Swiss-Prot record:
Species in which this protein is naturally found: Haemophilus influenzae (strain PittEE)
Any one GO cellular component localisation term in the record: cytosol
This protein's name: Probable Fe(2+)-trafficking protein
GO molecular function: iron ion binding
Pfam families: Iron_traffic
Similarity remark: Belongs to the Fe(2+)-trafficking protein family.
SUPFAM superfamilies: YggX-like
Role according to the record: Could be a mediator in iron transactions between iron acquisition and iron-requiring processes, such as synthesis and/or repair of Fe-S clusters in biosynthetic enzymes.
Keyword set, alphabetical order: Iron
Length: 90
């Protein structure tokens, strides 16, 4: 049976992650309170950020920036701003 969590991003009960995907205390917080759906949405934003800002994961400052954006997105309800990106209209 799938594990459920109260997702802080979706603000509802949803299927939880299968295992901890991020190290440390932040990783535990993500595992305990972020759903698969929210994590999937974050991964899309993360990919856009890395590509548009040309982030290098070997650079500690770039990793710190990405981690802060992740916390803002998943836990603080702040959308990721990518300069020049206009989301498609429905």
């Amino acid at each position: 049976m799938a594990r459920t969590v109260f997702c802080e991003y979706l603000k509802k009960e949803a299927e939880g992650l299968d295992f901890q995907l991020y190290p440390g205390e932040l990783g535990k917080r993500i595992f305990d309170s972020v759903s698969k759906q929210a994590w999937s949405e974050w991964i899309k934003k993360q990919t856009m950020l890395v590509n548009e800002k040309k982030l290098n994961m070997m650079n500690a400052e770039h990793r710190k920036l990405l981690e802060q954006e992740m916390v803002n997105f998943l836990f603080e309800g702040k959308d990721v701003h990518i300069e020049g990106y206009v989301p498609p209209s429905n």
